[in-house]
């Protein structure tokens, strides 16, 4: 009887699954554990890559602003500290490898981590070395012909009323306003890119295809190197530059402290210093000049910056003025230049009629400027740099500046490039 019981037990198969499950349980637990460790390694990979991206961008932003790339990248790595690093970070400016190798405007960061995890250690799986590598660079964001140097939260560039602005280039402002460029009313704006240190709001006033670049890095003053007027420039500054209605007058370069143009004025080649007065051009006046630069300043600018000259060119005036083209001239490409010591208390107005021809840069670093073009006005090469810039009326600026002495304004942005 005992023998029959043993035989039945040997023939019984109902416990096989349980036995097989018990035998395979270590493998199942190990596989699940290894999967858990793999998820952790994947998370670390994402975190270390994010840390490398952030550090490279911090380094590139430092380069853009003239600071030390390595210091900024190192500080950013310490700040984020998403992953415990097992090797000293590699920070290169310029990179030694990749498409930006040797580029001093680029920063490459390589980070490394490695750590054993419980399940993989039990299974004898060696912990992988996880890398994060990123390269960020300061690159050009486009060519600009309108630059606003405003640094506060005030709107930098305004396009209003029925202004039709076709610039054939970009516009950029250092304004930190939430909408740093205002395109309102029935204005139509064809300018790309549109960049700002602050925010930018999409608008139907922008032409189709316009690229908006909010939160860009500040643009440098493209004319920061122009010399500031000195006492020597004001020698014999007791002259009047004027023409009555219906008469024609010609003038030589020099210093003038009284300007009132109602007739026709011809300016000879050279630099004209306008001392502590308003450069007024009447509605029916005509002013002609080639290779000229008009500097709005004051002989007492150091003690009384509010005395610095301004400009007011009325609509209807015929303005035929071209800046110097000789690159040996320190003012090459500059048509109007207001002393940068001017207080932010005035607006400079430049208008013109359909017969006007303007070529050169308008530079008003300390004050606002307003430009109102007219249909048919020739402005093939005009650049504008002001603390704030306002467009009213029609402005069709093609900006074909070859051989004119007017340099391009190229702004930059920081982005990941590898």
Describe the residue ranges of each PLM region:
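Alpha-helical assembly-interface signal, strongest on the long, hydrophobic N-terminal helix that forms
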Residues: 1-75, 173, 177, 274
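Small-residue (G/S/T/A) turn/hinge positions that recur once per unit in extracellular repeat modules
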Residues: 161-165, 185-189, 200-212, 243-247, ...
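Short amphipathic secondary-structure patches
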Residues: 39-46, 50, 54-117, 136, ...
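Short, low-complexity, Pro/Ser/Thr/Gly-rich segments in the mature regions of secreted, periplasmic
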Residues: 232-243, 402-418
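Acidic/polar low-complexity surface segments
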Residues: 214-237, 284, 291-299, 312-341, ...
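Beta-strand-rich extracellular passenger or scaffold domains
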Residues: 153-160, 173, 179-183, 253-258, ...
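Extended compositionally biased segments used for macromolecular assembly or nucleic-acid engagement
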Residues: 16-18, 26, 30-33, 38-42, ...
